[in-house]
Amino acid sequence: MILKSLLKGLDYEVIKGNEESKVQNIRYDNRKIEQGDAFVCVKGFKVDGHSFIGDAIKKGAKTLIVQEDVSVQEDITIIKVRDTRKALAIMSSNYFGNPKDKLKIIGITGTNGKTTSAFIIKSILEKAGFMTGLIGTIANYIGNKKVDAVRTTPESYELHELFKNMVDAGVEYCVMEVSSHSLELDRVYGIQFEEGIFTNLTRDHLDFHKTFENYYNAKFKLFERSNHSIINLDDPYGANIVKDIEERGVKTKVSTFSIEKESDFKAFEIKSHSNGSEFKVNLEGIEEFSINIPGEYNIYNSLGCIICAYNLNIPMDKIKEGLSDVVIPGRCELVAKEKNLPYSIIIDYAHTPDGLENILSTVKAFTKNRMISVFGCGGDRDKVKRPQMGKIGCELSDIAIITSDNPRSEEPMDIINDIVKPLNYDNFVIEVNRKEAIRKAMNMALEGDVIVIAGKGHETYQILKDETIHFDEREVVYDILEGK
Protein backbone atom coordinates (compact mmCIF):
# COMPACT_ATOMS: atom_id res chain seq x y z
CA MET A 1 0.00 0.00 0.00
CA ILE A 2 1.23 3.53 -0.74
CA LEU A 3 2.22 5.45 2.42
CA LYS A 4 0.21 8.52 1.38
CA SER A 5 -2.98 6.41 1.32
CA LEU A 6 -2.26 5.14 4.84
CA LEU A 7 -1.83 8.71 6.08
CA LYS A 8 -5.19 9.93 4.72
CA GLY A 9 -7.06 11.86 7.41
CA LEU A 10 -3.88 12.69 9.36
CA ASP A 11 -2.02 15.97 9.79
CA TYR A 12 1.62 15.09 9.25
CA GLU A 13 5.01 16.38 8.17
CA VAL A 14 7.42 14.51 5.91
CA ILE A 15 10.74 14.87 7.73
CA LYS A 16 12.70 12.60 5.43
CA GLY A 17 12.02 10.37 2.44
CA ASN A 18 8.98 10.00 0.23
CA GLU A 19 5.28 9.66 1.08
CA GLU A 20 4.77 7.85 -2.24
CA SER A 21 6.85 4.91 -0.96
CA LYS A 22 5.30 1.47 -0.56
CA VAL A 23 4.45 0.03 2.87
CA GLN A 24 3.98 -3.71 3.44
CA ASN A 25 2.29 -3.51 6.85
CA ILE A 26 1.92 -1.34 9.94
CA ARG A 27 3.58 -2.36 13.20
CA TYR A 28 3.61 -0.78 16.66
CA ASP A 29 5.50 -3.73 18.21
CA ASN A 30 9.13 -3.78 17.03
CA ARG A 31 9.30 -7.56 17.65
CA LYS A 32 6.83 -8.16 14.81
CA ILE A 33 8.49 -6.01 12.14
CA GLU A 34 9.23 -7.51 8.73
CA GLN A 35 10.91 -6.13 5.61
CA GLY A 36 9.18 -3.02 4.23
CA ASP A 37 6.94 -2.35 7.25
CA ALA A 38 6.08 1.03 8.75
CA PHE A 39 6.93 1.28 12.46
CA VAL A 40 4.61 3.49 14.51
CA CYS A 41 6.55 4.68 17.56
CA VAL A 42 3.86 4.63 20.23
CA LYS A 43 4.73 6.26 23.55
CA GLY A 44 3.59 3.92 26.31
CA PHE A 45 3.63 4.25 30.09
CA LYS A 46 6.48 1.81 30.59
CA VAL A 47 8.20 1.78 27.20
CA ASP A 48 8.55 4.29 24.38
CA GLY A 49 8.50 3.00 20.81
CA HIS A 50 11.00 5.70 19.85
CA SER A 51 13.61 3.75 21.87
CA PHE A 52 13.31 0.79 19.48
CA ILE A 53 13.90 2.62 16.20
CA GLY A 54 17.36 1.09 15.71
CA ASP A 55 16.02 -2.43 16.21
CA ALA A 56 13.07 -1.72 13.91
CA ILE A 57 15.37 -0.58 11.10
CA LYS A 58 17.58 -3.67 11.53
CA LYS A 59 14.49 -5.85 11.12
CA GLY A 60 13.51 -4.13 7.88
CA ALA A 61 11.32 -1.14 8.74
CA LYS A 62 11.45 1.38 5.88
CA THR A 63 9.09 3.99 7.35
CA LEU A 64 8.96 5.54 10.82
CA ILE A 65 5.91 7.33 12.22
CA VAL A 66 7.14 9.50 15.11
CA GLN A 67 5.99 12.26 17.44
CA GLU A 68 9.50 13.10 18.72
CA ASP A 69 12.45 14.49 16.79
CA VAL A 70 14.59 11.59 15.59
CA SER A 71 17.62 11.30 13.36
CA VAL A 72 18.66 8.22 11.36
CA GLN A 73 21.40 7.79 8.76
CA GLU A 74 19.71 5.00 6.78
CA ASP A 75 17.50 5.45 3.72
CA ILE A 76 14.33 5.64 5.80
CA THR A 77 11.14 7.69 5.38
CA ILE A 78 10.25 9.62 8.55
CA ILE A 79 6.75 11.02 9.08
CA LYS A 80 6.11 13.22 12.10
CA VAL A 81 2.64 13.48 13.67
CA ARG A 82 1.36 15.11 16.81
CA ASP A 83 0.17 11.86 18.44
CA THR A 84 1.32 8.42 17.30
CA ARG A 85 -1.50 6.62 19.13
CA LYS A 86 -4.11 8.52 17.13
CA ALA A 87 -2.01 8.00 14.00
CA LEU A 88 -1.94 4.24 14.62
CA ALA A 89 -5.76 4.19 14.83
CA ILE A 90 -6.27 6.16 11.59
CA MET A 91 -3.56 4.31 9.67
CA SER A 92 -4.89 0.92 10.82
CA SER A 93 -8.38 1.82 9.63
CA ASN A 94 -6.99 2.92 6.25
CA TYR A 95 -4.82 -0.19 5.94
CA PHE A 96 -7.82 -2.52 6.37
CA GLY A 97 -10.06 -0.50 4.03
CA ASN A 98 -11.98 1.44 6.71
CA PRO A 99 -14.24 -1.47 7.72
CA LYS A 100 -15.63 0.60 10.62
CA ASP A 101 -17.62 2.59 8.06
CA LYS A 102 -19.33 -0.59 6.83
CA LEU A 103 -20.57 -1.62 10.30
CA LYS A 104 -23.14 -0.22 12.70
CA ILE A 105 -21.14 -0.11 15.93
CA ILE A 106 -22.72 -0.08 19.40
CA GLY A 107 -20.48 0.89 22.32
CA ILE A 108 -21.08 0.11 25.99
CA THR A 109 -19.08 1.71 28.79
CA GLY A 110 -19.29 1.63 32.58
CA THR A 111 -17.55 -0.05 35.50
CA ASN A 112 -19.92 -3.02 35.61
CA GLY A 113 -22.52 -4.46 33.25
CA LYS A 114 -20.66 -4.08 29.95
CA THR A 115 -20.38 -7.80 29.22
CA THR A 116 -23.97 -8.61 30.19
CA SER A 117 -25.26 -5.71 28.09
CA ALA A 118 -23.15 -6.71 25.09
CA PHE A 119 -24.44 -10.29 25.15
CA ILE A 120 -28.06 -9.10 25.53
CA ILE A 121 -27.80 -6.78 22.51
CA LYS A 122 -26.10 -9.50 20.45
CA SER A 123 -28.90 -11.91 21.39
CA ILE A 124 -31.59 -9.38 20.40
CA LEU A 125 -29.96 -8.50 17.07
CA GLU A 126 -29.51 -12.16 16.17
CA LYS A 127 -33.15 -12.90 16.99
CA ALA A 128 -33.98 -10.09 14.55
CA GLY A 129 -31.95 -11.83 11.85
CA PHE A 130 -28.79 -9.69 11.87
CA MET A 131 -25.36 -11.29 11.82
CA THR A 132 -23.65 -9.67 14.79
CA GLY A 133 -20.07 -9.31 15.99
CA LEU A 134 -19.09 -8.84 19.62
CA ILE A 135 -15.89 -7.43 21.11
CA GLY A 136 -15.46 -7.82 24.84
CA THR A 137 -14.00 -9.23 28.02
CA ILE A 138 -14.98 -12.89 27.61
CA ALA A 139 -14.12 -13.27 23.93
CA ASN A 140 -14.66 -11.71 20.54
CA TYR A 141 -17.31 -13.16 18.26
CA ILE A 142 -17.76 -12.98 14.51
CA GLY A 143 -21.33 -14.22 14.36
CA ASN A 144 -21.15 -17.52 16.27
CA LYS A 145 -17.41 -17.96 15.72
CA LYS A 146 -15.48 -17.32 18.94
CA VAL A 147 -12.12 -15.53 18.88
CA ASP A 148 -10.24 -15.32 22.19
CA ALA A 149 -9.88 -11.82 23.65
CA VAL A 150 -6.58 -10.58 25.12
CA ARG A 151 -8.07 -7.36 26.53
CA THR A 152 -11.57 -5.86 26.75
CA THR A 153 -10.92 -3.57 23.78
CA PRO A 154 -8.07 -4.60 21.44
CA GLU A 155 -5.28 -2.23 20.33
CA SER A 156 -6.42 -0.16 17.33
CA TYR A 157 -4.56 -2.25 14.71
CA GLU A 158 -6.10 -5.53 15.94
CA LEU A 159 -9.46 -3.82 16.34
CA HIS A 160 -9.63 -2.71 12.70
CA GLU A 161 -8.37 -6.12 11.58
CA LEU A 162 -11.25 -7.65 13.55
CA PHE A 163 -13.69 -5.20 11.94
CA LYS A 164 -12.41 -6.27 8.50
CA ASN A 165 -12.89 -9.95 9.36
CA MET A 166 -16.42 -9.13 10.50
CA VAL A 167 -17.27 -7.26 7.30
CA ASP A 168 -15.80 -10.09 5.19
CA ALA A 169 -17.99 -12.58 7.09
CA GLY A 170 -21.17 -10.56 6.47
CA VAL A 171 -21.54 -8.96 9.92
CA GLU A 172 -23.86 -5.93 9.97
CA TYR A 173 -23.73 -4.89 13.63
CA CYS A 174 -20.80 -4.92 16.04
CA VAL A 175 -21.43 -4.66 19.79
CA MET A 176 -18.38 -3.47 21.73
CA GLU A 177 -17.43 -3.23 25.37
CA VAL A 178 -15.55 0.06 25.40
CA SER A 179 -13.12 0.17 28.32
CA SER A 180 -11.84 3.38 29.89
CA HIS A 181 -8.32 2.27 28.91
CA SER A 182 -9.30 2.04 25.23
CA LEU A 183 -10.86 5.50 25.30
CA GLU A 184 -7.90 7.07 27.10
CA LEU A 185 -5.33 5.27 24.92
CA ASP A 186 -7.14 6.12 21.66
CA ARG A 187 -7.71 2.49 20.65
CA VAL A 188 -11.18 3.51 19.42
CA TYR A 189 -10.09 6.90 18.04
CA GLY A 190 -11.87 7.78 14.79
CA ILE A 191 -14.80 5.41 15.35
CA GLN A 192 -18.33 6.84 15.26
CA PHE A 193 -20.75 4.78 17.34
CA GLU A 194 -24.37 4.31 16.34
CA GLU A 195 -25.37 3.93 20.01
CA GLY A 196 -23.37 4.59 23.19
CA ILE A 197 -24.62 3.09 26.47
CA PHE A 198 -23.60 4.13 30.00
CA THR A 199 -24.23 1.44 32.64
CA ASN A 200 -22.71 2.84 35.86
CA LEU A 201 -19.55 4.28 37.34
CA THR A 202 -17.80 3.11 40.51
CA ARG A 203 -14.21 3.04 41.67
CA ASP A 204 -12.01 0.92 39.37
CA HIS A 205 -8.79 1.16 37.34
CA LEU A 206 -7.44 4.03 39.45
CA ASP A 207 -4.06 2.29 39.27
CA PHE A 208 -4.16 3.50 35.64
CA HIS A 209 -6.26 6.68 35.66
CA LYS A 210 -4.91 7.96 39.04
CA THR A 211 -8.00 10.10 39.79
CA PHE A 212 -11.72 9.47 39.58
CA GLU A 213 -12.08 12.62 37.47
CA ASN A 214 -9.71 11.16 34.87
CA TYR A 215 -11.68 7.90 34.93
CA TYR A 216 -14.96 9.78 34.40
CA ASN A 217 -13.54 11.90 31.57
CA ALA A 218 -12.22 8.79 29.81
CA LYS A 219 -15.69 7.20 29.93
CA PHE A 220 -17.31 10.44 28.73
CA LYS A 221 -15.37 10.30 25.46
CA LEU A 222 -17.72 7.56 24.20
CA PHE A 223 -20.68 9.95 24.14
CA GLU A 224 -18.72 12.56 22.18
CA ARG A 225 -18.52 9.91 19.44
CA SER A 226 -22.04 8.44 19.61
CA ASN A 227 -25.03 9.37 17.45
CA HIS A 228 -27.32 8.35 20.30
CA SER A 229 -26.36 8.22 23.99
CA ILE A 230 -28.30 6.00 26.42
CA ILE A 231 -27.69 6.93 30.06
CA ASN A 232 -28.54 5.25 33.39
CA LEU A 233 -30.01 8.15 35.32
CA ASP A 234 -30.13 6.29 38.65
CA ASP A 235 -26.35 6.12 38.73
CA PRO A 236 -24.94 9.19 40.54
CA TYR A 237 -22.82 10.03 37.49
CA GLY A 238 -25.61 9.56 34.95
CA ALA A 239 -27.00 13.05 35.56
CA ASN A 240 -23.46 14.46 35.30
CA ILE A 241 -23.04 12.88 31.86
CA VAL A 242 -26.37 14.30 30.64
CA LYS A 243 -25.43 17.74 32.03
CA ASP A 244 -21.93 17.64 30.52
CA ILE A 245 -23.29 16.56 27.13
CA GLU A 246 -25.45 19.69 27.13
CA GLU A 247 -22.86 22.09 28.57
CA ARG A 248 -20.04 20.89 26.32
CA GLY A 249 -22.25 21.10 23.25
CA VAL A 250 -21.85 17.42 22.37
CA LYS A 251 -23.86 16.50 19.28
CA THR A 252 -25.65 13.34 20.39
CA LYS A 253 -29.29 12.46 20.98
CA VAL A 254 -29.82 11.48 24.64
CA SER A 255 -32.19 8.87 26.10
CA THR A 256 -32.26 8.16 29.84
CA PHE A 257 -33.45 5.10 31.76
CA SER A 258 -34.04 4.33 35.43
CA ILE A 259 -35.88 2.36 38.09
CA GLU A 260 -35.99 5.06 40.80
CA LYS A 261 -35.75 8.52 39.19
CA GLU A 262 -37.98 9.97 36.51
CA SER A 263 -36.46 9.33 33.09
CA ASP A 264 -37.39 8.79 29.45
CA PHE A 265 -37.75 5.03 30.01
CA LYS A 266 -38.51 3.87 33.55
CA ALA A 267 -39.00 0.25 34.64
CA PHE A 268 -42.01 -0.41 36.87
CA GLU A 269 -44.08 -3.28 38.30
CA ILE A 270 -40.85 -5.20 38.86
CA LYS A 271 -41.09 -8.83 40.01
CA SER A 272 -37.78 -10.41 41.02
CA HIS A 273 -37.03 -14.03 41.90
CA SER A 274 -34.11 -16.45 41.96
CA ASN A 275 -34.39 -17.19 38.22
CA GLY A 276 -34.62 -13.62 36.97
CA SER A 277 -37.04 -10.70 36.77
CA GLU A 278 -40.11 -9.39 34.99
CA PHE A 279 -40.75 -5.69 34.54
CA LYS A 280 -42.67 -3.20 32.42
CA VAL A 281 -41.48 -0.21 30.40
CA ASN A 282 -43.52 2.44 28.63
CA LEU A 283 -42.15 2.69 25.09
CA GLU A 284 -44.84 3.62 22.53
CA GLY A 285 -47.13 1.68 24.84
CA ILE A 286 -46.61 -0.41 27.97
CA GLU A 287 -44.49 -3.49 27.24
CA GLU A 288 -43.59 -6.35 29.59
CA PHE A 289 -40.12 -7.91 29.55
CA SER A 290 -38.44 -10.81 31.31
CA ILE A 291 -34.79 -11.72 31.85
CA ASN A 292 -33.51 -15.06 33.13
CA ILE A 293 -30.61 -13.58 35.13
CA PRO A 294 -31.46 -12.44 38.69
CA GLY A 295 -30.59 -9.10 40.26
CA GLU A 296 -31.83 -5.53 40.06
CA TYR A 297 -28.56 -4.53 38.38
CA ASN A 298 -29.47 -6.82 35.48
CA ILE A 299 -32.75 -4.93 35.07
CA TYR A 300 -30.62 -1.81 34.60
CA ASN A 301 -28.47 -3.65 32.06
CA SER A 302 -31.63 -4.81 30.27
CA LEU A 303 -33.11 -1.30 30.12
CA GLY A 304 -30.11 0.13 28.27
CA CYS A 305 -30.27 -2.74 25.78
CA ILE A 306 -34.03 -2.44 25.24
CA ILE A 307 -33.69 1.28 24.43
CA CYS A 308 -30.75 0.58 22.12
CA ALA A 309 -32.75 -2.03 20.18
CA TYR A 310 -35.83 0.23 20.19
CA ASN A 311 -33.75 3.06 18.65
CA LEU A 312 -32.58 0.63 15.95
CA ASN A 313 -36.22 -0.22 15.11
CA ILE A 314 -35.88 -3.87 16.13
CA PRO A 315 -39.35 -5.50 16.34
CA MET A 316 -40.66 -5.64 19.92
CA ASP A 317 -41.18 -9.42 19.88
CA LYS A 318 -37.52 -9.91 18.90
CA ILE A 319 -36.35 -7.59 21.70
CA LYS A 320 -38.34 -9.64 24.22
CA GLU A 321 -37.16 -12.94 22.78
CA GLY A 322 -33.49 -11.91 22.75
CA LEU A 323 -33.71 -10.66 26.33
CA SER A 324 -35.41 -13.73 27.76
CA ASP A 325 -33.15 -16.23 25.95
CA VAL A 326 -29.73 -14.65 26.59
CA VAL A 327 -26.96 -16.74 28.20
CA ILE A 328 -23.86 -15.02 29.62
CA PRO A 329 -20.83 -17.12 30.66
CA GLY A 330 -19.51 -16.39 34.16
CA ARG A 331 -22.25 -13.94 35.09
CA CYS A 332 -24.36 -15.33 37.96
CA GLU A 333 -23.70 -18.74 36.43
CA LEU A 334 -25.18 -21.73 38.26
CA VAL A 335 -22.67 -24.61 38.19
CA ALA A 336 -23.22 -28.38 38.60
CA LYS A 337 -26.99 -27.93 38.65
CA GLU A 338 -27.45 -31.40 37.14
CA LYS A 339 -25.69 -32.97 40.17
CA ASN A 340 -28.71 -32.14 42.37
CA LEU A 341 -26.47 -31.04 45.23
CA PRO A 342 -28.13 -30.04 48.52
CA TYR A 343 -26.49 -26.63 48.08
CA SER A 344 -26.00 -24.31 45.07
CA ILE A 345 -22.79 -22.99 43.50
CA ILE A 346 -22.72 -19.71 41.57
CA ILE A 347 -19.72 -18.35 39.66
CA ASP A 348 -19.59 -14.62 38.93
CA TYR A 349 -17.02 -12.20 37.50
CA ALA A 350 -17.64 -9.60 40.26
CA HIS A 351 -14.21 -8.08 40.94
CA THR A 352 -15.05 -4.55 42.13
CA PRO A 353 -16.71 -3.46 45.40
CA ASP A 354 -19.89 -2.52 43.53
CA GLY A 355 -19.90 -5.76 41.54
CA LEU A 356 -19.38 -7.88 44.66
CA GLU A 357 -22.14 -6.04 46.52
CA ASN A 358 -24.52 -6.54 43.59
CA ILE A 359 -24.01 -10.29 43.27
CA LEU A 360 -24.00 -10.99 47.02
CA SER A 361 -27.11 -8.86 47.65
CA THR A 362 -28.92 -10.59 44.79
CA VAL A 363 -28.02 -14.11 45.92
CA LYS A 364 -28.73 -13.33 49.58
CA ALA A 365 -32.32 -12.44 48.66
CA PHE A 366 -33.08 -15.99 47.51
CA THR A 367 -30.72 -18.01 49.76
CA LYS A 368 -32.71 -20.36 52.01
CA ASN A 369 -29.93 -21.03 54.52
CA ARG A 370 -26.39 -19.58 54.56
CA MET A 371 -24.48 -17.73 51.86
CA ILE A 372 -20.77 -18.60 51.63
CA SER A 373 -18.61 -16.30 49.51
CA VAL A 374 -15.18 -17.05 48.05
CA PHE A 375 -13.26 -14.03 46.74
CA GLY A 376 -9.97 -12.15 46.59
CA CYS A 377 -8.48 -9.12 44.85
CA GLY A 378 -6.19 -8.82 41.84
CA GLY A 379 -2.52 -7.94 42.23
CA ASP A 380 -0.94 -4.82 40.69
CA ARG A 381 -4.32 -3.10 40.78
CA ASP A 382 -6.00 -0.36 42.84
CA LYS A 383 -5.30 -1.23 46.49
CA VAL A 384 -7.98 1.06 47.93
CA LYS A 385 -10.77 -1.32 46.91
CA ARG A 386 -9.25 -4.27 48.82
CA PRO A 387 -10.57 -3.39 52.33
CA GLN A 388 -13.84 -2.24 50.74
CA MET A 389 -14.36 -5.66 49.19
CA GLY A 390 -13.42 -7.37 52.46
CA LYS A 391 -16.03 -5.32 54.33
CA ILE A 392 -18.74 -6.02 51.71
CA GLY A 393 -17.92 -9.74 51.62
CA CYS A 394 -18.08 -10.12 55.40
CA GLU A 395 -21.16 -7.91 55.87
CA LEU A 396 -23.27 -9.70 53.28
CA SER A 397 -22.00 -13.28 53.66
CA ASP A 398 -22.65 -15.67 56.50
CA ILE A 399 -19.15 -17.03 55.87
CA ALA A 400 -16.50 -15.34 53.72
CA ILE A 401 -13.49 -17.31 52.48
CA ILE A 402 -10.81 -14.85 51.41
CA THR A 403 -8.35 -16.21 48.90
CA SER A 404 -6.09 -15.42 45.97
CA ASP A 405 -7.38 -14.00 42.67
CA ASN A 406 -4.81 -13.05 40.00
CA PRO A 407 -1.91 -12.01 42.26
CA ARG A 408 0.37 -11.09 39.34
CA SER A 409 3.69 -9.76 40.69
CA GLU A 410 2.47 -9.36 44.28
CA GLU A 411 2.63 -11.92 47.07
CA PRO A 412 -0.88 -13.42 47.49
CA MET A 413 -0.72 -13.14 51.29
CA ASP A 414 0.15 -9.43 51.07
CA ILE A 415 -3.02 -8.84 49.05
CA ILE A 416 -5.11 -10.87 51.51
CA ASN A 417 -3.65 -8.87 54.42
CA ASP A 418 -4.75 -5.66 52.67
CA ILE A 419 -8.27 -7.12 52.43
CA VAL A 420 -8.58 -8.31 56.05
CA LYS A 421 -6.41 -5.84 58.01
CA PRO A 422 -9.17 -3.32 58.83
CA LEU A 423 -11.94 -5.92 59.22
CA ASN A 424 -13.77 -6.19 62.51
CA TYR A 425 -15.63 -9.42 61.74
CA ASP A 426 -15.27 -13.02 62.90
CA ASN A 427 -17.08 -14.70 59.99
CA PHE A 428 -14.15 -14.97 57.59
CA VAL A 429 -11.42 -17.52 57.02
CA ILE A 430 -8.28 -17.27 54.91
CA GLU A 431 -7.18 -19.87 52.36
CA VAL A 432 -4.47 -18.64 49.98
CA ASN A 433 -4.87 -21.49 47.48
CA ARG A 434 -7.96 -20.69 45.41
CA LYS A 435 -8.82 -24.32 44.62
CA GLU A 436 -8.56 -25.24 48.30
CA ALA A 437 -10.71 -22.22 49.20
CA ILE A 438 -13.43 -23.52 46.85
CA ARG A 439 -13.02 -27.01 48.34
CA LYS A 440 -13.35 -25.56 51.85
CA ALA A 441 -16.59 -23.81 50.87
CA MET A 442 -18.02 -27.00 49.34
CA ASN A 443 -17.01 -29.10 52.36
CA MET A 444 -18.73 -26.77 54.82
CA ALA A 445 -21.88 -26.21 52.71
CA LEU A 446 -25.14 -27.48 54.18
CA GLU A 447 -28.56 -28.04 52.65
CA GLY A 448 -30.02 -24.77 51.36
CA ASP A 449 -26.66 -22.96 51.35
CA VAL A 450 -25.44 -21.01 48.33
CA ILE A 451 -21.73 -20.68 47.51
CA VAL A 452 -20.76 -17.60 45.48
CA ILE A 453 -17.31 -17.85 43.87
CA ALA A 454 -16.56 -14.27 42.80
CA GLY A 455 -13.84 -12.55 40.81
CA LYS A 456 -12.93 -14.74 37.85
CA GLY A 457 -16.21 -15.70 36.17
CA HIS A 458 -15.50 -16.66 32.56
CA GLU A 459 -11.71 -16.66 33.00
CA THR A 460 -9.90 -19.95 32.47
CA TYR A 461 -6.53 -18.92 33.90
CA GLN A 462 -4.81 -17.55 36.98
CA ILE A 463 -1.99 -15.01 36.66
CA LEU A 464 0.81 -15.72 39.14
CA LYS A 465 4.16 -13.99 39.63
CA ASP A 466 6.17 -16.11 37.20
CA GLU A 467 3.53 -17.88 35.12
CA THR A 468 -0.07 -17.99 34.00
CA ILE A 469 -1.73 -21.31 34.81
CA HIS A 470 -4.92 -22.94 33.54
CA PHE A 471 -7.66 -22.35 36.11
CA ASP A 472 -11.31 -22.84 35.16
CA GLU A 473 -13.58 -22.66 38.20
CA ARG A 474 -16.22 -24.84 36.57
CA GLU A 475 -13.60 -27.57 36.14
CA VAL A 476 -12.39 -27.01 39.71
CA VAL A 477 -15.90 -27.56 41.08
CA TYR A 478 -16.34 -30.81 39.12
CA ASP A 479 -12.84 -32.00 40.12
CA ILE A 480 -13.68 -31.47 43.79
CA LEU A 481 -16.98 -33.31 43.38
CA GLU A 482 -15.02 -36.21 41.88
CA GLY A 483 -12.61 -36.23 44.82
CA LYS A 484 -9.65 -34.70 42.97
From Swiss-Prot:
SUPFAM superfamilies listed in its UniProt record: MurD-like peptide ligases, catalytic domain, MurD-like peptide ligases, peptide-binding domain, MurE/MurF N-terminal domain
Cofactor(s) annotated in UniProt: Mg(2+)
Residues spanning the signal sequence: none
Gene Ontology BP terms: cell division; cell wall organization; peptidoglycan biosynthetic process; regulation of cell shape
Function: Catalyzes the addition of meso-diaminopimelic acid to the nucleotide precursor UDP-N-acetylmuramoyl-L-alanyl-D-glutamate (UMAG) in the biosynthesis of bacterial cell-wall peptidoglycan.
Protein name: UDP-N-acetylmuramoyl-L-alanyl-D-glutamate--2,6-diaminopimelate ligase
Motif residue range(s): Meso-diaminopimelate recognition motif: 405-408
PTM text: Carboxylation is probably crucial for Mg(2+) binding and, consequently, for the gamma-phosphate positioning of ATP.
GN (gene name): murE
Coiled coil: none
Pathway membership: Cell wall biogenesis; peptidoglycan biosynthesis
Residues recorded as bearing N6-carboxylysine in the entry: K219
SS bond list: none
Residues annotated as binding UDP-N-acetyl-alpha-D-muramoyl-L-alanyl-D-glutamate: T152, T153, S179, R187
Catalysed reactions, semicolon-separated: UDP-N-acetyl-alpha-D-muramoyl-L-alanyl-D-glutamate + meso-2,6-diaminopimelate + ATP = UDP-N-acetyl-alpha-D-muramoyl-L-alanyl-gamma-D-glutamyl-meso-2,6-diaminopimelate + ADP + phosphate + H(+)
GO cellular component: cytoplasm
Taxonomic lineage: Bacteria, Bacillati, Bacillota, Clostridia, Eubacteriales
